[in-house]
Curated annotation (Swiss-Prot):
<feature type="domain" description="Globin">
    <location>
        <begin position="1"/>
        <end position="141"/>
    </location>
</feature>
<keyword id="KW-0561">Oxygen transport</keyword>
<feature type="modified residue" description="N6-acetyllysine; alternate">
    <location>
        <position position="16"/>
    </location>
</feature>
<feature type="modified residue" description="Phosphoserine">
    <location>
        <position position="124"/>
    </location>
</feature>
<feature type="modified residue" description="Phosphoserine">
    <location>
        <position position="102"/>
    </location>
</feature>
<dbReference type="GO" id="GO:0019825">
    <property type="term" value="F:oxygen binding"/>
</dbReference>
<feature type="modified residue" description="Phosphoserine">
    <location>
        <position position="49"/>
    </location>
</feature>
<dbReference type="InterPro" id="IPR009050">
    <property type="entry name" value="Globin-like_sf"/>
</dbReference>
<feature type="binding site">
    <location>
        <position position="58"/>
    </location>
    <ligand>
        <name>O2</name>
    </ligand>
</feature>
<feature type="modified residue" description="Phosphoserine">
    <location>
        <position position="3"/>
    </location>
</feature>
<dbReference type="GO" id="GO:0031838">
    <property type="term" value="C:haptoglobin-hemoglobin complex"/>
</dbReference>
<dbReference type="GO" id="GO:0005833">
    <property type="term" value="C:hemoglobin complex"/>
</dbReference>
<dbReference type="Pfam" id="PF00042">
    <property type="entry name" value="Globin"/>
</dbReference>
<comment type="function">
    <text>Involved in oxygen transport from the lung to the various peripheral tissues.</text>
</comment>
<keyword id="KW-0349">Heme</keyword>
<dbReference type="GO" id="GO:0043177">
    <property type="term" value="F:organic acid binding"/>
</dbReference>
<dbReference type="InterPro" id="IPR002338">
    <property type="entry name" value="Hemoglobin_a-typ"/>
</dbReference>
Length: 141
């Protein structure tokens, strides 16, 4: 459960992300593909090379989804319902991959926002991404 302090930290951090959400999403995906090569199996039709248009496009989708989630911290299940359906029923993504991408997102954010990435902000963002992952995998059961 996100506390009011967590919500404040998440919104403040995401304000710093600003218009870079798609870029950071793509960077996190690329980091995930390099660090956890098995995740590439879900993207057999993608050009996974550095800076590819397909990775950038999917990164924008990730960034947009997270921006939407930040705007709906009090109703993540409602905000992410369609995305949860897509990943559970159509794409059938292994739930562990959400944890891997979350880790890569945290590394990416820490890299780009070092002075803002305090231990408290790190903890809040980690809880947020864990909550998003929980919602995205909730329909697997």
């Amino acid at each position: 459960v996100l506390s009011s302090a967590d919500k404040t930290n998440i919104k403040a951090a995401w304000d710093k992300v600003g218009g870079n959400a798609g870029e950071y999403g793509a960077e996190a995906l690329e980091r995930m593909f390099l660090s956890f090569p098995t995740t590439k199996t879900y993207f057999p039709h993608f050009d996974l090379s550095h800076g590819s248009a397909q990775v950038k496009g999917h990164g924008k989708k990730v960034g947009d989804a997270l921006t939407n989630a930040v705007g709906h911290l009090d109703d993540l299940p409602g905000a992410l319902s369609a995305l949860s359906d897509l990943h559970a029923y159509k794409l059938r993504v292994d739930p562990v991959n959400f944890k891997l991408l979350s880790h890569c997102l945290l590394v990416t954010l820490a890299n780009h926002l070092p002075s803002d990435f305090t231990p408290a902000v790190h903890a809040s963002l980690d809880k947020f991404l864990a909550s998003v992952s929980t919602v995205l995998t909730s329909k697997y059961r």
